[in-house]
Amino acid sequence: LREGLICGAIDYLATDHAPHTLEENAAGISGVPLLDTFGAFLCRLADEGIPWEVLVDRASTTPAKIFSRFSDGHFGDLQPGSVASLAVLDVDRSWTIERSQVRSRAGWSPFEKTPFPGKVIETVIRGVRWEAATSSLIQQA
């Protein structure tokens, strides 16, 4: 899969995010919360040698081009006129996810106790800045 990313055989990276609680899963609803760790996995792939240029292209630029017909703005790059929706990663802040850190409705992660070489520290959604660890508003658009 890593070679497919580098050579372009894999067009884009995405994550499923089904933030069901453990109780809902036990009752037969399938799916796991993965959005909380997507940025951390990008840091891991970079740490394993996949260039950031490739990761940004596959996780942001290309998906935005593919799905642009469904949006009302220009997403996927950092250019004047683009919609400011992005994640800010600290690639030097290693962390191990703990249940108490999970921000999604699920309240758990399949990667609890898994170490990552970096993490998302801030998100920007349509120009509104949010602190990732607490989901606190940093700045309005």
Provide a role label for each language-model segment:
Residues 80-141:
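C-terminal cap of metal-dependent C-N hydrolases
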Residues 1:
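Phosphate/diphosphate-binding loops
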Residues 4-7, 12-13, 17-91:
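His/Asp/Glu-enriched, well-ordered alpha-helical/loop segment
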